[in-house]
Amino acid sequence: MPTNLHAWNALQQHHDAIRDHQMADWFAENGADRVRQFSLEAAGLYLDYSKNRITPQTMQLLLQLADEAGVPARRDAMFAGEHINATEDRAALHVALRATAGAGFKVDGVPVVPAIQNVLVRMRAFSEAVRSGAWTGTTGERITDVVNIGIGGSDLGPKMVCRALSHLAHDDGHSGPRMHFVSNVDGTELAEALERLDPRRTLMIVCSKTFTTLETMANAHSARQWYLDNGVAEDQLARHFVAVSTNVDAVRAFGIDPANMFEFWDWIGGRFSLWSSVGLSTALAVGFNAFADLLAGGRAMDEHFRTAPLERNMPVVLGMLGIWYRNFFNLPTSCMAPYSTSLELFPAFLQQLEMESNGKTVQLNGRRVRTHTSPVVWGTAGTNGQHAYFQMIHQGSQIVPVDFVAPLVPPRELPGHHAKLLANCFAQAEALMRGRSAEELRAAGMTDELRIAHMVFEGNRPSNTLLMEDLTPHVLGALIALYEHRTFVQGVVWNINSFDQWGVELGKILARPIESELNGAQAGSHDASTAALIARARGVLARNG
């Protein structure tokens, strides 16, 4: 366990020695050297991590901890296709999805890249057919809208990417279809999406590895009925449905031509699947060339993660800074603040990536962890967050580390807007670090001591700033892969399995009999609270038919 490692104990002592030091003092001593020492560039991303409560010794000890915890060895095992997902006895080889055609990735001794490349060829052909108008609905009309039906990784990842790259929808000379994403089993979401669409011009992508996911299949069957209710004959449905799945029999039974099924594999976790055929929605929305560039960006970050020394390794540095705050400062949350509306869904994507991966209490050896694991991850796009929760980040009783992310060139620009956006991003990070003292306020002429007390900012609040020149598919791919590997690094240090998600299973199991009871079956055995909730819901449902 990590707490037995020499570097962990050294970091505890080091934390006690520096925890009251002010970052502003370190910057005053030699800020330019500090920025040079605590900044990195890789795969089109620039990371400034100088506004953290760290010294060179801190980083030396954190990187020593990464080494002692086995980060390099576990990284190499992942790239080698070993079964690092121990509880499911699987590889976690999502990096192979973005590999070049000649790469030698194997699972259980079998090369996987040829199968991946075959799916990519089919994705290119299909997406180009839809975007060019060669693939039509049953009436011969062009597809103008695509609905992606999936949940979790089959929704959050591709939805985030499509939103981030929406400015590229016309870059290949074709007008991409409008993308809609439906995930929730709440029928309101699907109903509201469908009421705006023409079934003759709409294509459905049903994303489910097993083709049995409750929410996804409920929505898929309702979408199927929508076509039938609107005059599309059952034998014509195949022109309006494609599947992303591994279950050929279930896909065929649903009425989708297996020729229009795009496969992926059980060694790809849902939250890492946007690089696979789950990314078909991305290829349809912005063109396959953009999707290929996304893969190339992820591949560039993979190569950096695999080869860079720990002290110059961006995922390792970010991961270990997260360990520093979660386990030594005992900070329970972290904030993602992208200063780009295009990246507004990135915080939600990170919530699944980090909390589903590392929200664990059991180590690889089956023993309970003795440290905190994943923080609560949250955030929204700037500058909106400044007018919502940044008050708490600046002056609240709880310190929240922030990651600021900003493209220097906007995807779309109105005169003067982007300079204001960047100014606010940089100012927030500076204000969190510097703070504002009572002496500064008095020197500025303020004399009301009560007001001064309320206007003091303690400062010394940490942040990272990640910059990119512009938000290209390549850079977005690198950004996503950066946080994937950061999450992996932290899981290795905590000695947990970042690739399973047993925590979502129990609720699914309990929901099945409750659904039957809500539909009139005899009440089962529940605690008093759950039984009362079921009874109340049954009464209302009965009155409303």
Curated annotation (Swiss-Prot):
Domain of life: Bacteria
Cross-referenced InterPro entries: G6P_Isomerase, G6P_Isomerase_C, Phosphoglucose_isomerase_CS, SIS_dom_sf, SIS_PGI_1, SIS_PGI_2
SUPFAM superfamilies: SIS domain
Reaction equations catalysed: alpha-D-glucose 6-phosphate = beta-D-fructose 6-phosphate
Cysteine disulfide partners in this protein: none
EC number from the UniProt entry: 5.3.1.9
Function: Catalyzes the reversible isomerization of glucose-6-phosphate to fructose-6-phosphate.
Protein name: Glucose-6-phosphate isomerase 1
Originating gene: pgi1
